[in-house]
């Protein structure tokens, strides 16, 4: 929200936010119910890349592995046979399963971290920004990030528009680059996530 406000201010336009469910967000953009999607979207699938365009990234995120503060888990290799709290339909759940983890089904990150704290699960593989947000809001959670995906596996999130809006993408990208250059994106990342998330 804050990045979108800063971009709108740079462009001299008024922004109206419409909250929607994740599952209907891209369909709403495609149908013209929204002009822009600004919700940590990376456009990684070929289907989305064929339908939508993305501005320069305003944030970067990748997978992180979270375990209790006293855990011996240090990497994905360590979760083989280990109880790992995951949403069964997520990419992270698939990645944990492929690593040989024993999946404990959950509805989301907060439940995953609660199960780890309660020693009903040992780890979770999840999105870095979601975890950083949780840890910023819950500094005494008793869990920590024990492994992070390398920079070349991180995905950049930008402002998303329907394909063919080249002028909008160019304007958004210029504004985002200016916000990087003047330190605004770094400041927002540190304020909300405890670190600069504007760089890969």
Predicted regions and their residues:
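Extended ligand-binding regions for polar small-molecule ligands
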Residues: 1-10, 90, 156-195
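Flexible hinge/capping segments at coil-to-helix
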Residues: 56, 67-84
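Hydrophobic residues within well-ordered alpha-helices
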Residues: 7, 29-30, 79, 116-117, ...
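Short helix-loop capping/hinge motifs at secondary-structure junctions, enriched
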Residues: 69-77, 104, 164-170
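Periplasmic-binding protein-like
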Residues: 59-67, 128, 132, 136-177, ...
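Alpha-to-beta junction loops
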Residues: 12-14, 30-39, 83, 118-130, ...
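Extracytoplasmic small-molecule ligand-binding "clamshell" domains
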Residues: 1-41
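Short helix-initiation/N-cap motifs at beta->coil->alpha
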Residues: 16-27, 88-90, 104-118
């Amino acid at each position: 929200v804050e990045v979108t406000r800063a971009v709108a201010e740079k462009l001299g336009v008024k922004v109206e936010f419409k909250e929607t469910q994740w599952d209907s967000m891209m369909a709403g953009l495609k149908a013209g119910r929204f002009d822009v999607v600004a919700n940590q979207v990376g456009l990684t699938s070929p289907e989305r890349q064929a339908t939508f365009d993305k501005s320069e990234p305003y944030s970067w995120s990748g997978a992180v592995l979270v375990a209790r503060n006293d855990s011996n888990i240090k990497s994905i290799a360590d979760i083989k046979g280990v109880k790992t709290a995951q949403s069964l339909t997520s990419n992270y759940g698939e990645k944990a399963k492929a690593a040989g983890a024993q999946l404990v089904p959950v509805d989301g990150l907060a439940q995953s971290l609660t199960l780890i704290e309660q020693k009903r699960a040992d780890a979770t593989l999840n999105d870095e920004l979601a975890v950083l947000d949780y840890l910023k809001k819950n500094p005494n959670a008793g869990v920590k990030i024990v492994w992070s995906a390398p920079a070349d596996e991180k995905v950049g999130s930008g402002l998303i528009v329907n394909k063919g809006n080249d002028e909008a993408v160019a304007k958004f990208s210029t504004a985002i680059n200016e916000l990087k250059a003047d330190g605004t994106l770094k400041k927002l990342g540190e304020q909300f996530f405890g670190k600069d998330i504007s760089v890969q």
